[in-house]
Amino acid sequence: MEGSKTSSSTMQVSFVCQRCSQPLKLDTSFKILDRVTIQELTAPLLATAQLKPGETQEEEANSGEEPFIETRQDGVSRRFIPPARMMSTESANSFTLIGEASDGGTMENLSRRLKVTGDLFDIMSGQTDVDHPLCEECTDTLLDQLDTQLNVTENECQNYKRCLEILEQMNEDDSEQLGLELKELALEEERLIQELEDVEKNRKIVAENLEKVQAEAERLDQEEAQYQREYSEFKRQQLELDDELKSVENQMRYAQMQLDKLKKTNVFNATFHIWHSGQFGTINNFRLGRLPSVPVEWNEINAAWGQTVLLLHALANKMGLKFQRYRLVPYGNHSYLESLTDKSKELPLYCSGGLRFFWDNKFDHAMVAFLDCVQQFKEEVEKGETRFCLPYRMDVEKGKIEDTGGSGGSYSIKTQFNSEEQWTKALKFMLTNLKWGLAWVSSQFYNK
């Protein structure tokens, strides 16, 4: 409630408001308190608070002669309470007045004054429900509240007075009637109390049922939350499975499209592309033959022969044809024919050129043997298709191919004692016959 601040040789004491805690500056009158002022400040609100028990009874007896005094026209009864200063001045709350010290306010006088002021505020706080000291604003607020309470109390007093007047006007009959009504009301009260007890019992039962229902509702909420989590998980899995299903369906559609495309694709035509490049017949862009003006590398010629052997071997397997006298062995650019009469005899369909090429006739024998296999393929096709005819007739014994539709000349498939131009043309005619055979096999076995 009080604080202190030390500065050099003096001490300034300040108090704070007990409501807003703001620092207060005390009025100068606190420095010159006399005995009467102190008694007025410390006196209780009611005079009976200072009386002894015997004196209180005597006061009450004396006051019974004139309990109410009409002082205003508003009908409010008031009792006169003598002020505390009219009572004995020798009370426990008396103070010893402190004057100014001769030395201008020593620390001892300041401490005594602080103690007197603090005790004064404590006594004032003990006499009422309000703690002291208060600032001016809080005091105004407190006064407003007290005025409001006073108005409410005055209104209550007026209401009590009106009720008293009504009671005084009632006669004895009304009293008897009121007694009967009172008994009826007492019975009604007992009945209502019984109903209240029944309602209370029902309330307890309902409260127990409510607790059970709330527990069940909480359990259902937990189950609902669990079901919601499971539903969300299943929904996520469903979405993932839907995505996978759509992906699989797209893959199936793509695979079906590729399958339909493959079904429509001629495997032989796609694998073996026979065409021509100038005077050369080509298979898969490999030229078969050579000219003085265009010396094709033997590696390319050997690769073309490898593709040609592979084509005839595939056509024969498709038809189920077994060649007589020779067996085709596709082996890339080192393909050859194997003699069935002499297993150790191999006829190579590849050559490296050089001087050995002119004296070694195995390459020529291999090309004639291959022409024999083409002739066997033609004869096998003619057994089932009499109208089938190749554009160039082949003479296996001489190893030549005749240009029946053109000049009518014959061209040897051998290299010895033959020009490169005629050899290249014979190979071109042979590839043309194979192209016709490939087209026939594709037409016959396309849907098989």
Curated annotation (Swiss-Prot):
Give the span(s) annotated as Required for membrane-association.
Answer: 423-448
Q: What molecular function terms (GO) are annotated for this protein? A: phosphatidylinositol 3-kinase binding; protein-macromolecule adaptor activity
Q: How does it sit in the membrane?
A: Peripheral membrane protein
Q: Does the keyword Ubl conjugation apply?
A: yes
- Localization, UniProt: Cytoplasm; Golgi apparatus, trans-Golgi network membrane; Endosome membrane; Endoplasmic reticulum membrane
Instruction: Write out the ranges of the annotated region (Interaction with BCL2).
Output: 110-157
Residue span of region Evolutionary conserved domain (ECD)? 243-448
Superkingdom as given in the UniProt entry? Eukaryota
Which of UniProt's keywords are assigned here? Acetylation, Antiviral defense, Apoptosis, Autophagy, Cell cycle, Cell division, Coiled coil, Cytoplasm, Cytoplasmic vesicle, Endoplasmic reticulum, Endosome, Golgi apparatus, Isopeptide bond, Membrane, Mitochondrion, Nucleus, Phosphoprotein, Ubl conjugation
Motif annotated as BH3, chain positions = 106-125
N-acetylmethionine-modified residues are M1
Please outline how this chain is modified post-translation: Phosphorylation at Thr-117 by DAPK1 reduces its interaction with BCL2 and BCL2L1 and promotes induction of autophagy. In response to autophagic stimuli, phosphorylated at serine residues by AMPK in an ATG14-dependent manner, and this phosphorylation is critical for maximally efficient autophagy. Polyubiquitinated by NEDD4, both with 'Lys-11'- and 'Lys-63'-linkages. 'Lys-11'-linked polyubiquitination leads to degradation and is enhanced when the stabilizing interaction partner VPS34 is depleted. Deubiquitinated by USP10 and USP13, leading to stabilize the PIK3C3/VPS34-containing complexes. Polyubiquitinated at Lys-400 with 'Lys-48'-linkages. 'Lys-48'-linked polyubiquitination of Lys-400 leads to degradation. Deubiquitinated by ATXN3, leading to stabilization.
Gene3D superfamilies with a match to the protein in the record: 6.10.250.3110, Autophagy protein 6/Beclin 1
The UniProt record lists the Glycyl lysine isopeptide (Lys-Gly) (interchain with G-Cter in ubiquitin) crosslink at: K400, K435
Similarity field: Belongs to the beclin family.
Subunit details: A homodimeric form is proposed to exist; this metastable form readily transits to ATG14- or UVRAG-containing complexes with BECN1:UVRAG being more stable than BECN1:ATG14. Component of the PI3K (PI3KC3/PI3K-III/class III phosphatidylinositol 3-kinase) complex the core of which is composed of the catalytic subunit PIK3C3, the regulatory subunit PIK3R4 and BECN1 associating with additional regulatory/auxiliary subunits to form alternative complex forms.
Note from the entry? Expanded poly-Gln tracts inhibit ATXN3-BECN1 interaction, decrease BECN1 levels and impair starvation-induced autophagy.
Q: What does this protein do?
A: Plays a central role in autophagy. Acts as a core subunit of the PI3K complex that mediates formation of phosphatidylinositol 3-phosphate; different complex forms are believed to play a role in multiple membrane trafficking pathways: PI3KC3-C1 is involved in initiation of autophagosomes and PI3KC3-C2 in maturation of autophagosomes and endocytosis. Involved in regulation of degradative endocytic trafficking and required for the abscission step in cytokinesis, probably in the context of PI3KC3-C2. Essential for the formation of PI3KC3-C2 but not PI3KC3-C1 PI3K complex forms. Beclin-1-C 35 kDa localized to mitochondria can promote apoptosis; it induces the mitochondrial translocation of BAX and the release of proapoptotic factors.
What name is this protein filed under? Answer: Beclin-1
